[in-house]
């Protein structure tokens, strides 16, 4: 049975601004997936739906889980504040589906349910600032290069758009709104009206009227939408108004208008409008010129391709794809047991990273590389030629092995390599680390990882569910001792596949083990330290 995806925009957050269709869709759903703050905002509308809530930067895992559950036959609601199609989850859900080869006719059904976007809800609190041409620009450069955002701000400022800035500032991103103000001041008066709206229609709503010059003197954060007026926007009685232009034709303080209805659309009543006849002539000339250019270009291209084909003796494609540069991330190490980098490897790292890339040594005995490139395959080839072990970065399975006393205690190495071969780099609900130690000393801390195996007296001990960070961090629970070497790989593999299949997005293994109570026949026991621990400020 096919499931269904309901991608819901629930507006600013107040129940009275949630559309009837959005309410119905929430009630229809078997499962609600969303950012945890958004789930809390609609808590009063939930009944017995299964809830999966995750933190910021987990949008992809939410979309993937939603698709997975819908393909399993469930009706899944993916929620966004505002409108799901405006910086929301709608596009990402489509992208995940497309990656899986989804087709509208044969795949799971998808419905996008619109909501009130921030530009609309904030405008209603400010007055009527978006009565004329407007645009939205997100200042978050986590996914969009800042150079491109700058161009968009510049274009909007030059064109006299009313601009609504989303995601203007965060704890780490503080310069973007400063740069946006600088660009706008090149084209607009310092007295241009600006409205700052925080948490529109929520409990901690704040509305501030200011101007372009002074806007940074007020608190601006991730929950703020910054609305910058155009050259005609004005303040009146604590309201921000952008005229539509009616004053050009109408007398707003009189009931008797100078132009009769049949006169208002005549050419002489709109001297500022585009001359339609001249525009048609110019358009026809432009089209003819473009057509001639295209024909000339096509002829030249055909001739060039014919010559190239004669040289190469094979057909060539007329389509040329411009390479797109992006940040390529990969983790490298000398090997699972080997912890020693060679001079050749270090030289190779310097070469492939270059001036623009970065290298970061991690606690997992790897070096994480971030390299701007349009050709990641060439980088992979160079790293492999230098005998690096390559691992993907993110929510994947990673082995953190000891050095087996520089190879002297090597009995566990073949099993380590087999686990890497079968599972290394596999996608997980959350990053999953398997610690492996080659003797009972466990000096590399295998018992402190999500899953730990320790080779001792010719067999393996198995530890599950360590909590690796926080004041209440603890070692894994020992669930089995003396596992035969021939069995350990299969046991670990089954545990990991069960976590991959049943774990929630962003759910760490120790939380998964606690929730399901039993993993591959191993029972959970609460070994959390019995002390009062305040929640970590980061939300751990």
Swiss-Prot record:
Q: How is the cofactor bound?
A: Binds 1 [4Fe-4S] cluster.
Record EC number: 2.1.1.272
What cofactor(s) does the depicted protein rely on? [4Fe-4S] cluster
Could you cite one Gene Ontology molecular function of this protein?
oxidoreductase activity
Which residues of the sequence carry a binding annotation for [4Fe-4S] cluster?
402, 405, 439, 443
Q: What keywords does the record list, in alphabetical order?
A: 4Fe-4S, Cobalamin biosynthesis, Iron, Iron-sulfur, Metal-binding, Methyltransferase, S-adenosyl-L-methionine, Transferase
SUPFAM superfamilies attached here?
Nitrite and sulphite reductase 4Fe-4S domain-like (SSF56014), Tetrapyrrole methylase (SSF53790)
Q: What does this protein do?
A: Is also able to convert cobalt-precorrin-3 to cobalt-precorrin-4.
Q: Which family does it belong to?
A: In the N-terminal section; belongs to the precorrin methyltransferase family.
Q: Could you tell me which NCBIfam families the record lists for this protein?
A: cobJ_cbiH
Q: What is this protein called?
A: Cobalt-factor III methyltransferase
